[in-house]
Amino acid sequence: MKRIKCLLHSFAAFLFTGIAASFFVQTLVSCSNDPVLVNPEGFAGSIGGKETGLWTISNGDMVLQATNYGGRVVSLWVPEGNGEMVDVVLGHGTLDEYVNYRRERFLGAVVGPVANRIVGASYSHDGRTYRLSANHNGTGTLHGGFRGLDSVVWDFVSQTDSSLTFHCLHPDGAEGFPGNLDILMTYTLTSDCTWKIDYLATTDAVRPVNISNHPYFNLGGEGSGTCGDYVLWVNADSFLGTDGPDVIETPILVEGTAFDYRTPHLVRDALESGDPQIVRSNGGFDHNFCINGEGMREAASLYNPSNGILLSVWTDQPGLQLYSGQWWTGEERGKNGKSLDRFGSFTFETQNWPDAPNKPSFPNPFLEPGETYTHHCEYRFRIME
């Protein structure tokens, strides 16, 4: 592969107790190493009579590989401050590992048709109650049930040098959801080192829709250590707490809690806080933040001081699920044979609020015939100097 010329934006300044400077300095970096790509042969096969594969796209600055099994992102190479490329997402090197390794079935996948939790594995709408698959502790529905969007083979639609489009039909009655849900998803790499995700969906019956993506980020590369010393910022005045299997209906103000990241500070500050919500979630984040504002806006950012990479998350959705990888044990291995350690990754899942079908005060999750569901998400990568 030819050397990759990376046009990067770097922050002119960043205050660890304040806000990033509002202007950028453009820097042209010649990356000194080529990405070590996953071999597509490990993904060639079929599941349920549908062919599987691995596709590679690049914009000259970044390289992304994705499989149509669950629409998963397998690798994402971006430039770091020393002029080299680094793969910043966790993944596996073969299809078999994704299909048969079930400890973390959502690794890099599209999740839905209703991401996150539906408490009680049921919801009522227009006087009718819908019973769903109870795949979460036997009492709730998580990420669409036993066979969600992560566990099916998507149809390949089209590819350009820098974009890839998949299609999926979630059929009427699957996992208990009514109506046929027709979904298009496009991954795009833009010229400013951004990975864009766009979802479009239509239905022939009223049903809840909340599609998201589940990439695990380690900005130093898979197996490079924990994210505790990363600097986190979240654009949220409140978050949703949990109470056992339930999602607390009234948002909790972040003021005075371990969840207040309106000013950037270390991830480990929350992990070591002893906050009851953190303790209840095995010592880490697994919570929905109620993002301030509407429309396309910045929801959160994560900075790795060791290599200068800043990841900024933008979305038009009302919520952002933060998960700090506390359920990894170190016994698992990723695509490079390195251990997947506790707190060794971070997910930002742009979404509607969890359990919205059961909570009328939450943003409306229901899609009706004749309407189009849209969801836009951007992961923007920059180098800070």
Language-model-detected regions and their locations in the chain:
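N-terminal secretory signal peptides that target proteins for export/translocation
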Residues: 1-9
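Bacterial N-terminal signal peptides
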Residues: 11-27
